[in-house]
Regions:
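Auxiliary Fe-S-binding modules of radical SAM enzymes
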Residues: 44, 49-88, 117-118, 122, ...
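Conserved SAM/AdoMet-binding glycine-rich loop
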Residues: 2-190, 195
């Protein structure tokens, strides 16, 4: 029913990072596949204008679907390259007072749609399939991985698989989880790399280097996003300049300066990593201590 009213969606985003701890993990995977998000699944964008018109006729949220239909009609008009067709569609929109939201009416939408429909439908039929993706947005727990779970993840259109790597204490477990998934054919990974928490600055360097080296060793892609820790509660919850016990303001500023250059992301490529963070741990600290302005 949701698909009928709102149209099919390309991607599936799951916000619960405890899925692996669930006793019904296998059932969750089966539900994802049954919903059309199995490995290799594709998606063709539905005719959202047709859906908007149907919902208007059912009087389902008139205000919202009047706005939606008008936006789709205007977007279609702006995409037209043929001058004759462009003028025809513009005339239909103008005559029905759809060029301004203040003058747009339900009947005006209906009238313009009758003119636009055959051309719009033709464009929809030309749409090509796109790959679907499943994203466990909060990341899954490397400590819970088993070969069976890796095999199950490989059955769905997961892209990328986010595996948390919050500290060096889970290094071996994390590397094992990545290798299990790679053996099942998964090649796209991502994670947030927490820093400025209870970690030491060198831990950030080591975790990033591990990811880059895994990319080279296993021929996979891991995109790392260093994420500065900030307390949500207690006396530091409103302190935007919070500094962890093992960190200092200079170190934090230096890391942020490097991330500004890398656009916040570190992917595969040892040479790029070495230029950004140093070839050795000593070079990393040299970068952290480098003057802000050269």
């Amino acid at each position: 029913r949701v698909r009928e009213i709102c149209g099919d969606q390309r991607d599936l985003l799951l916000m619960d990072n405890n899925v692996m701890a669930s006793k019904r993990f296998d059932d969750i995977i089966e539900d994802i596949i049954a919903s059309g998000f199995g490995a290799g699944a594709t998606y063709i964008e539905p005719n959202m204008l047709e859906i908007a018109i149907k919902n208007l006729k059912k009087e389902t949220n008139d205000r919202g679907y009047i706005k939606k239909a008008r936006t789709l009609l205007l977007d279609y008009y702006k995409s037209i390259k043929d001058k004759e067709l462009s003028y025809k569609i513009y005339s239909a929109l103008e005559e029905n007072h759809l060029m301004r939201i203040e003058t747009t009416t339900k009947q005006g939408i209906y009238n313009a749609y009758e003119v636009v429909k055959p051309y719009y439908d033709k464009k929809v039929k030309l749409r090509r399939p796109k790959r679907r993706s499943v994203d466990f947005n909060q990341g899954v727990d490397a400590r819970l991985f088993t070969p069976h779970m890796a095999k199950q993840f490989a059955r769905i259109a997961i892209n990328p698989l986010r595996i948390a790597f919050d500290n060096m204490a889970i290094k071996d477990t994390y590397v094992s989880a990545i290798k299990m998934c790679q053996q099942e054919g998964l090649r796209k990974f991502s994670n947030y790399i927490l820093y400025n928490f209870n970690d030491e600055p060198i831990d950030l360097y080591r975790r990033l280097k591990i990811n880059v080296e895994l990319c080279e060793e296993l021929d996979i892609d891991i995109y790392s996003f260093p994420m500065k820790y900030h307390p949500l509660f207690d006396e530091h919850s409103h302190d935007r300049n919070y500094i962890g016990k093992q960190w200092n303001m200079k170190y934090v500023r230096s890391v942020q300066a490097v991330l500004n250059v890398t656009k916040g992301c570190i992917g595969r490529g040892l040479s790029f990593f070495y230029r950004a963070f140093g070839r050795t741990e000593k070079e990393f600290f040299d970068i952290l201590l480098m003057p802000d302005a050269m």
